[in-house]
Design a protein with these regions (language model features):
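A short glycine-rich, Lys/Arg-flanked "PGG" loop and its adjoining helix->strand segment in the class I
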Residues: 76-90
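Short amphipathic alpha-helical segments
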Residues: 54, 73-74
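Conserved binding-pocket/active-site segment within a compact domain
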Residues: 44-46, 60-62, 79, 83
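Class I (Rossmann-like) S-adenosyl-L-methionine-dependent methyltransferase catalytic domain
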Residues: 1-55, 91-197
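A short SAM/SAH-binding and catalytic strip from SAM-dependent methyltransferases
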Residues: 59-73
């Protein structure tokens, strides 16, 4: 989910305003609130149509929303609106295509009618990245399988990428057997990574 991937990034503070655009039944909103975030809001046209649709938030999540919008123009409009609401980043997830999923689906427009009679647009990783670039002229960064982030805050993006590289370096050093007998080097890199990532 977007919320799980978002929590893994450690991008925000407890005071960050997070808006779940198309929140469904509110599972991600609940998860973020249980994780200590105070300013989490959700809106969904079907389940929470009367909730306030925020006009500005630090972070906006868009979990599996693009998959269920049948009209291509409405799909693009939704993505653009969610992106415009975010001041720091938009985190979104999409269903990726797989043979298991598609074997029971009926082709319809640019997507499928699922086995439970709902519209689904499945994407390949290359297709969703091209779609985002065509609309926003920005390359999304992959957080997890089918989950991406589009930064609006360049400093935050650089901070995220730096911490990600430090984390990868720390994992490499911890796994590298040539450091087995060099406790000092391994411990030093590990402490440095912990300091940077905290």
């Amino acid at each position: 989910s977007c919320a799980g991937a978002f929590l893994d990034t450690t991008l925000s503070t407890i005071g960050s305003v997070i808006f779940d655009y198309g929140c469904g039944r509110g599972d991600d909103v609940s998860l973020l609130k249980k994780s200590g975030y105070k300013n989490v809001f959700g809106w969904d046209p079907h389940f929470f149509p009367d909730s306030k649709k925020l006009s500005k938030a630090d972070f906006v999540t868009l979990s599996f929303v693009l998959n269920v919008i049948e009209d291509k123009d409405e799909r693009s409009k939704t993505l653009l609106e969610a992106y415009s609401i975010s001041s720091k980043a938009l985190i979104f997830s999409v269903m990726l295509d797989s043979q298991n999923t598609l074997q029971y689906a009926i082709p319809y427009n640019d997507g499928y009618i699922s086995s439970i009679s709902t519209f689904q647009k499945y994407y390949s990783p290359a297709e969703i990245e091209e779609y985002i670039y065509a609309l926003l002229k920005i390359h999304p960064l992959k957080l997890a399988n089918g989950v991406y982030i589009i930064f609006k805050d360049e400093f935050l993006q650089q901070d995220y990428l730096f911490k990600k590289q430090i984390g990868l370096l720390a994992q490499t050093v911890k796994q590298d057997t040539s450091f087995e007998n060099d406790f000092y080097s391994t411990e030093l890199v590990s402490q440095f990574a912990d300091l940077i990532l905290s």
